[in-house]
Swiss-Prot record:
Belongs to the bacterial ribosomal protein bL33 family. GO terms for cellular component: cytosolic large ribosomal subunit. HAMAP family: Ribosomal_bL33. Gene3D superfamilies: Ribosomal protein L33 (2.20.28.120). Keywords: Ribonucleoprotein, Ribosomal protein. InterPro entries: Ribosomal_bL33 (IPR001705), Ribosomal_bL33_CS (IPR018264), Ribosomal_bL33_sf (IPR038584), Ribosomal_zn-bd (IPR011332). This is Large ribosomal subunit protein bL33. It comes from Gluconacetobacter diazotrophicus (strain ATCC 49037 / DSM 5601 / CCUG 37298 / CIP 103539 / LMG 7603 / PAl5). One of its GO terms (molecular function) is structural constituent of ribosome. Coiled coil: none annotated. It comes from the Bacteria.
Length: 55
């Protein structure tokens, strides 16, 4: 059986609230760090979320 191309990553809030999302990305197609603007319910606004490894 072939190894999957997708890996699970954690998107951590840049507002330092401790809030994070867990999502998947294609490791071969996207080699850089993922960054997207999403809603942080602790800060109650949209902020940048950056990729971090799941420990």
């Amino acid at each position: 059986m072939a190894k999957s191309n997708t890996i699970q990553i954690k998107l951590v809030s840049s507002a330092d609230t401790g809030y994070f999302y867990v999502t998947k990305k294609n490791a071969r197609a996207q080699t850089g760090k993922l960054e997207m603007r999403k809603y942080d319910p602790v800060a109650r606004k949209h902020v940048a979320f950056r990729e971090a490894k799941i420990k």
